[in-house]
């Protein structure tokens, strides 16, 4: 039976354990994701508390991260989504981007830092592309490309 969380506390605590183990074992999210049958972005978001994992995928990542049966069950629960606190936009279109950042923001940050190092993706030296494409299931889809220059953090 599918279970749902009523607060972020349990998933946040598990996410902290996961990131600590990932760091200690020198694993990448790509390595943790191998064998799940899911995208690395989805699995990363799940490990950071933003999605439930299917049972098989939860067991695969648990084996790599030395997680117990309680953690495997917790990874399968529907989380309280949104990892970035703050004000909420009211425009419906803008809100959807806010929602995307709430769900995937911590995932994007983790994957950018993992692939590029400590730094940011510039919104100044930046390209944005939006394309409308047909959805094979009917209707349309929006393909949005965010292309920003990586800027490393420089110690001083």
Swiss-Prot record:
It is an enzyme of class 4 (lyase). The active site is at 96, 99, 122. Its EC number is 4.2.1.104. Keywords: Lyase. The keyword Lyase applies. CDD domains: Cyanase_C (cd00559). SMART domains: Cyanate_lyase (SM01116). It catalyses: cyanate + hydrogencarbonate + 3 H(+) = NH4(+) + 2 CO2. Pfam families: Cyanate_lyase, CYNS_N. InterPro entries: Cyanase, Cyanate_lyase_C, Cyanate_lyase_C_sf, CYNS_N, Lambda_DNA-bd_dom_sf. One of its GO terms (molecular function) is DNA binding. It comes from the Bacteria. Belongs to the cyanase family. PANTHER family: CYANATE HYDRATASE (PTHR34186:SF2). Catalyzes the reaction of cyanate with bicarbonate to produce ammonia and carbon dioxide. This is Cyanate hydratase.
């Amino acid at each position: 039976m599918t279970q749902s969380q009523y607060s972020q506390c349990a998933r946040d605590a598990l996410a902290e354990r996961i990131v600590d183990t990932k760091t200690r074992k020198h694993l990448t999210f790509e390595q943790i994701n191998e064998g799940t049958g899911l995208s690395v972005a989805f699995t990363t978001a799940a490990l950071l508390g933003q999605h439930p994992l299917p049972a098989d995928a939860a067991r695969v990542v648990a084996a790599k991260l030395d997680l117990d049966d309680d953690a495997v069950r917790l990874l399968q629960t529907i989380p309280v989504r949104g990892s970035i606190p703050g004000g909420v936009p009211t425009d419906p279109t803008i809100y959807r981007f806010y929602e995307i950042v709430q769900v995937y923001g911590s995932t994007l940050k983790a994957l950018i830092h993992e692939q590029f190092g400590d730094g940011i993706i510039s919104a100044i030296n930046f390209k944005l592309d939006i394309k409308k494409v047909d959805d094979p299931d009917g209707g349309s889809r929006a393909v949005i490309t965010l292309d920003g220059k990586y800027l490393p953090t420089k110690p001083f």
